[in-house]
Amino acid sequence: MSSEESYRAILRYLTNEREPYAPGTEGNVKRKIRKAAACYVVRGGTLYYQRRQRHRKTFAELEVVLQPERRRDLIEAAHLGPGGTHHTRHQTWHYLSKTYWWRGILKQVKDYIKQCSKCQEKLDRSRPISDVSEMLEELGLDLESGEESNESEDDLSNFTSSPTTASKPAKKKPVSKHELVFVDTKGVVKRSSPKHCQAVLKQLNEQRLSNQFCDVTLLIEGEEYKAHKSVLSANSEYFRDLFIEKGAVSSHEAVVDLSGFCKASFLPLLEFAYTSVLSFDFCSMADVAILARHLFMSEVLEICESVHKLMEEKQLTVYKKGEVQTVASTQDLRVQNGGTAPPVASSEGTTTSLPTELGDCEIVLLVNGELPEAEQNGEVGRQPEPQVSSEAESALSSVGCIADSHPEMESVDLITKNNQTELETSNNRENNTVSNIHPKLSKENVISSSPEDSGMGNDISAEDICAEDIPKHRQKVDQPLKDQENLVASTAKTDFGPDDDTYRSRLRQRSVNEGAYIRLHKGMEKKLQKRKAVPKSAVQQVAQKLVQRGKKMKQPKRDAKENTEEASHKCGECGMVFQRRYALIMHKLKHERARDYKCPLCKKQFQYSASLRAHLIRHTRKDAPSSSSSNSTSNEASGTSSEKGRTKREFICSICGRTLPKLYSLRIHMLKHTGVKPHACQVCGKTFIYKHGLKLHQSLHQSQKQFQCELCVKSFVTKRSLQEHMSIHTGESKYLCSVCGKSFHRGSGLSKHFKKHQPKPEVRGYHCTQCEKSFFEARDLRQHMNKHLGVKPFQCQFCDKCYSWKKDWYSHVKSHSVTEPYRCNICGKEFYEKALFRRHVKKATHGKKGRAKQNLERVCEKCGRKFTQLREYRRHMNNHEGVKPFECLTCGVAWADARSLKRHVRTHTGERPYVCPVCSEAYIDARTLRKHMTKFHRDYVPCKIMLEKDTLQFHNQGTQVAHAVSILTAGMQEQESSGPQELETVVVTGETMEALEAVAATEEYPSVSTLSDQSIMQVVNYVLAQQQGQKLSEVAEAIQTVKVEVAHISGGE
């Protein structure tokens, strides 16, 4: 096989595990493929050749090129040097073989250089001519004529014809060289211009700004912006679907009303579509990302994500105007009332005031955990540091460490961008305070980055340096490691209690001692595992210690059925699955250990003191004035000075000014401003801001419901759903309204209920320009505009159905994921959303039996009669009370409901809209038709008798007009009987005459299907006006007066 085929066979052998060989491959060929594949490796679908480097133990991976066109292009690129020069064969081979490889690469390089005309000319000029014959050929002379010039031509001719020389091939007369250059004018030429794209965009943008060739007008906040449909549809799928649905592709100009869009967030996207440059204020980044997600502009979303990742990876904090500083408070936080912040030592030797939300506190700038020398001596001045080039660099990449030195205890606080690790001794935990910064700090107790460490490797991140330096520094502290273990053991004993198991307590002590619990919850554990391999896990080391002490470790109980690896890492109580056994052990401590820490202000309980402390901070934020005053009095009573207070660090968002307790919280908070949703579902692609929301969403895709109720048959996907369901059985609910005290089984019900107590805005600020609806929020208006524009942006990925509203799309998508739909026990209808099922049960009319099963009957308090429909109940109550608001204008009979009046009017007009499909007999109402079909056509009785929409509208209009005309003719006949010889003059407008003619036309020509509502209302209003005795003087002068004979009108009917 050829080299390309052999390479493809090797690539197939390395990638295709099911069929590594092509069909029909012989056994000897398979052996060769296996042997050759040992020198190759596949990276990202590309085949690489591993070549051993000389005098080294490493291998160089060279990409194998399979395409002949690409091989020639690579040889050409390696052969051509800078400035148009040509490399030699050795140089070309050297440059090319550094990265690429294929069989016969050297031969192809030689062949290419032989075909290169410029290299051949250079070779011909530089080659020395050593042979005489070559010289004669170059000069155009013959060999014989040069040596024997005295011989005549005859002798030459005889010499050439002699038999001795006849056997030798006669040399042709040398001819001077002629180079023939053939220019092929056929073929396809492909060249690309890198400036063409920008030039076209620039021209389109200029046309947009000068309103040239614009075919769409965008209305945003009352202002018009011209644009091109092709540019908008190329950048946004939203506009493309909009123009296709509305038929605006073929029309000359279209006007798009973008109500609900904000001009500040839309104009940057419009500029990006024409300039490919996205420029916006960082404060409005969230609005831009939300709008780009609505318009399906994926490139803008990628830019927003890259900006956020840059801020995450390089530890950037973006501020509009200002610099980042690492500050630490040296005053006790218990004194926090009033005043402005004291001056801060700046780099220029001046003092600046830093406004904070903590009140009066002295701010000291720390660089790598050391105080400036000028401040130690009592002066304020500059503090140069060789490690920090600028303030921004120190805030972005350096690690601020604050350390205290006391004769009794040591405390180290480590602050990084990704996490905040706090290592405290037992005395500090009991007192819940952190010692103040001592003015004289020794260099041994401070973790700082020295020039030697920085010189070892600049690519090491700050997290890795801090994580590796923690155990080294712990050994350098004056207090030995064994004493620290004893102190931690004493605190662990007080935390766990005497009844806890020894194994768990020891495991907990060790994890807290080494900071594993903090790393586990901060996401650092995986990084530490990747960086350095631990020979023994924490469980193995604890087991070894227990065996050495003569104690036997208790083996966890395992079921005989669960022998798989997955079952060994599954919690038996809650069903959670863990990848590591250590995580399962730590998780089981939550179930088996009692919640000893109770909040004195509320009823919540916690397992750890740190959780209780974090919970109490939330209470102190609500009662800040009272707590500060009580803390100040207790501080004076105890005699402690403000210098020995606890150092509190708060992180302030530069955009909204919100204060956050941790740097991690600030990072999560910044997601709201950037609009980036980093957590995406791999199944449906939905994105979330928080990882917890992604986990809850992923549980919806799971078909298995592992949490089952013990009291009933129901099962649930999440544990929270099971707990909410258990509140129905127990009657106890933790979701209580703080305003009215109403309890709810679910948190969603409480959140919906709480909106009733919140004051709604008096004015709906977002109005629809197409209809009269208005909305409180812009997103509701945007979704509402989808119906007017005909856009259906929400598409189902399973069946490609599209919807305008997100709730309709979500209800449809659940039909694919939900295995067991909600089914009505009466009519059998299936619903994939519980809200729709409840609405159906509440409002659907299943007949009397169905309503009785659902306990929705209404009983009359006076006679005890039961009703299944609300309108029947209301009509019955009107009969008891004597209220009959619906009166017939012909005979004056009043009815309790409009349905009875409509049926009665048909007796005057003679209209019978309900026709039997078998015998074609017509009836006034559906009930009479049902009686007829039950008596004579029992096999053809339908479930429900309804008129079609057009037919029903026609009959309703005909009933109104006929009723009005009958009233008119009856009044005319009465006046005729009173005065038969007189003609009555009736004031009729021209429009009314047209309506009456239309009525007559419908009676003469039954093919006419419907009437206009305006004509009907004109006739009805005219008749009512005649009944009420409207005077002629009140009629406007514009009304045309026509004399009409009553006999003529009656004759027309």
Curated annotation (Swiss-Prot):
There is a cross-link at K1043 (Glycyl lysine isopeptide (Lys-Gly) (interchain with G-Cter in SUMO2)). InterPro entries: BTB/POZ_dom (IPR000210), Integrase_H2C2 (IPR041588), SKP1/BTB/POZ_sf (IPR011333), ZBTB11_BTB_POZ (IPR048060), Znf_C2H2_sf (IPR036236), Znf_C2H2_type (IPR013087). It comes from the Eukaryota. CDD domains: BTB_POZ_ZBTB11. Residues 141-173, 546-566, 619-643 are annotated as: Disordered. It is linked to Neurodevelopmental disorder with progressive movement abnormalities, cognitive decline, and brain abnormalities: An autosomal recessive disorder characterized by global developmental delay, developmental regression, variably impaired intellectual development with poor or absent speech, difficulty walking or inability to walk, and various movement abnormalities, including spasticity, hypertonia, dystonia, tremor, and myoclonus. Affected individuals usually show poor overall growth, often with microcephaly, hypotonia, limb contractures, and cataracts. This is Zinc finger and BTB domain-containing protein 11. It comes from Homo sapiens. The lineage of its organism: Eukaryota, Metazoa, Chordata, Craniata, Vertebrata.
